[in-house]
Amino acid sequence: MKANNRNRTSVAIVGAGPNGAAMANLLGLYGVDTIVVERAPQIVEFPRAVGIDDEALRLFQTAGLADELSRDIIQNVPLRMFKANGECFADIRPSIREFGWWRRNIFMQHLAERTLRDALARYPHVSLRTGEEVVGLEQDDECVTLQVRAADGQQYELDADYVVAADGGRSPVREMLGIRLAGTTHPMKWVVVDVKNARLDQPCTALNCDPRRPNVCIYLPFNYRRWEFLVFPHEDEEAIAQPESIRALIAPYVDDVDRIEIVRARTYTHHSRVAERFVAGRVALIGDAAHLSPPWIGQGLNAGLRDVGNLAWKLAGVVNGTLHRRVISTYESERRDHAKAMIDLADTFGAMLMPTSRLVAFLRDRFLGLARYAPGLKDYVLQMRFKPMPSYTHGVVVTGTSDAVGRMIVQPDVETADGARRKLDDVLGPWFAIIGWRCDPQACLSDDDRAFWTALGAKFVQIVRSRSGTCREQRIASAHDSVCVEDVDNAMAEWFDRHAAPLVVVRPDRYVAAQTDAAGMAGVTAAFQAFAARQRETADVC
């Protein structure tokens, strides 16, 4: 294929929703030329995602946007479950912040999208084209050519080294690739309503598990509130979305239903589906284009952001010539099984929490009632330990070195040598890092191995016990440029007590790629050289 320089980029992203815009921000951070093509001329404001978790906020922290996004987020929102008689039978409010952020947070998708899109202005090498639609796709071993219809109806070709399809559950790109979205579509529909000025002092997400009309009530930012009501098969979905019907549904939960302002309403069908492939040649699917989940554990968007975190650095490394092209294929092997596991969990929760069977509701209430008296089970539920965490045994990991490998590393606060308190990721930087627990990681490397990690762009960080004085001494005496920080909350000490080896290779997505001691670093480095591009000039370009 011949490249047209006027319409050519390293990565083309199809779709500028939260996943596509997040991907563009990370690629911008990594210096990758990126063009985002979005069909809609404006941000869509009908009811969509509202839940964002600690892993997602950690990703936005890497992108330099967590604080700005947090201005529109209610953090640490509990999840409460109510019986048909109004009794609360479960109050889920996770207190742990192992990744540096609260586990349950509420936002409004259109506000986040605006922040993410505005942030792209930071990067002159990233452009957003709205009102443009991808209508065709061809690819070969060298690049991908997209046929794009512009807002004026004219078509042009856009050549890219790689394409990321973030174009939603009905993904045209997925259809063009002939990839099947396997799974089920649930027969029941739900009417989703966003309202304003509802007089309801209930600062939580409430699951009203009444088999007569299961529904969800969500406390949203800026005096908004969302209700989601089950629509029964005999009911007309258009009629139930009318204002008078909506007020009748909400009336049992508020004092003055006529006072509320109905902002928007839409009927949804839930899906439990996973694409048979996440990667096809030089095209990768992310978010709803790759998997669709019911909303019961609030992980639909968060699963998409895990895709973003996993794929962005791999694309950047390949395009920038530091990583071998084969690492892109590890995106599917690392992400697909976990995405499916989250969907299965959502299906289970939906069946348990929102049954229309009175018998199932009774058995659920009995089980959760008994769980209160079993401390281990109670903690498992209330701290959301039921959420399966990704654990990679294949991909960009060196297995066999530690049970921490393939899992996300914790993120406590640490203190720098000048006394500043910072989150660990802000010290590690947005790329690879090698952590040394109570040792300088560079001192544990041979000259050749140090040169390899330096060429890869890794940052070297030494973490020491709080108030040990080591950071000050190391800053004065070290022969290397490793950063030294103190473990002020003793969190890293606890982590290394569980995972004893003192050297950890951390990937840009904060997953542990390897853990070993000084004697094992040569082997880890050799294993990583298989993931690296043999020469910078071997980077694949159109």
UniProtKB/Swiss-Prot annotation:
Keywords: Aromatic hydrocarbons catabolism, FAD, Flavoprotein, NAD, Oxidoreductase
InterPro entries: 3-HPP/3HCI_hydroxylase (IPR023786), FAD-bd (IPR002938), FAD/NAD-bd_sf (IPR036188), PheA/TfdB_FAD_monoxygenase (IPR050631)
EC number: 1.14.13.127
Cofactor: FAD
Pfam families membership: FAD_binding_3
Record-level GO BP terms: 3-(3-hydroxy)phenylpropionate catabolic process; 3-phenylpropionate catabolic process
Reactions catalysed, as given in the entry: 3-(3-hydroxyphenyl)propanoate + NADH + O2 + H(+) = 3-(2,3-dihydroxyphenyl)propanoate + NAD(+) + H2O; (2E)-3-(3-hydroxyphenyl)prop-2-enoate + NADH + O2 + H(+) = (2E)-3-(2,3-dihydroxyphenyl)prop-2-enoate + NAD(+) + H2O
Pathway this chain belongs to: Aromatic compound metabolism; 3-phenylpropanoate degradation
Residues binding FAD: 10-39, 278-288
Enzyme class: oxidoreductase
Gene3D superfamilies recorded: 3.30.70.2450, FAD/NAD(P)-binding domain (3.50.50.60)
Molecular function (Gene Ontology), one example: 3-(3-hydroxyphenyl)propionate hydroxylase activity
Function noted in UniProt: Catalyzes the insertion of one atom of molecular oxygen into position 2 of the phenyl ring of 3-(3-hydroxyphenyl)propionate (3-HPP) and hydroxycinnamic acid (3HCI).
Entry similarity comment: Belongs to the PheA/TfdB FAD monooxygenase family.
The name this protein goes by in its record: 3-(3-hydroxy-phenyl)propionate/3-hydroxycinnamic acid hydroxylase
